[in-house]
Regions:
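Non-catalytic, conserved peripheral segments adjacent to functional cores
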Residues: 1-109, 125-127
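Short beta-strand His + acidic residue motifs that chelate non-heme Fe in jelly-roll/DSBH
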Residues: 111, 119-124
Length: 128
């Protein structure tokens, strides 16, 4: 597992090991111990999946205020998405700043979206 920092405070790109062969691939999407070893401790309360059949579908911006705020892990199981995050945390050094990230079935990257961030994505390919 590789955890990359970004220009937004507390946002991380997570790269899990991917094991592939002629049948496809296997990867862990979440392992509590590995995440904790990387300094990421999350108490997940919900797991969601979405499918957008057409390219160009925009989902978001999603934002929850305390006490409903959630840390999220976002990934694209199929296709390619462009995910945008905006730091909405008043007092944060990166408050009001945003960045976008490509997540795809090819790069297997996951995006750690901390509480207090708005996030949304647009599908760049069909069936995302």
């Amino acid at each position: 597992m590789n955890v990359l920092s970004t220009n937004l405070q507390d946002v991380k790109i997570i790269e899990m090991a991917v094991y592939g062969d002629h049948r496809g691939f296997f990867t862990e999407s979440y392992t509590k111990e590995k995440f904790a070893d990387a300094g990421i401790t999350i108490d997940f309360i919900q797991d969601n999946h979405s499918l957008s059949v057409e390219p160009g579908v925009l989902r978001g911006m999603h934002f929850q205020r305390t006490p409903k705020a959630q840390t999220k892990i976002v990934r694209a199981v199929t296709g390619v998405i462009y995910d945008v995050l905006v730091d909405m945390r008043i007092g944060s050094p990166t408050y009001g700043k945003w960045e976008g990230y490509i997540l795809s079935e090819h790069n297997h990257r996951q995006l750690l979206v901390p509480k207090g961030f708005a996030h949304g994505f647009v599908t760049l390919t069909p069936n995302c």
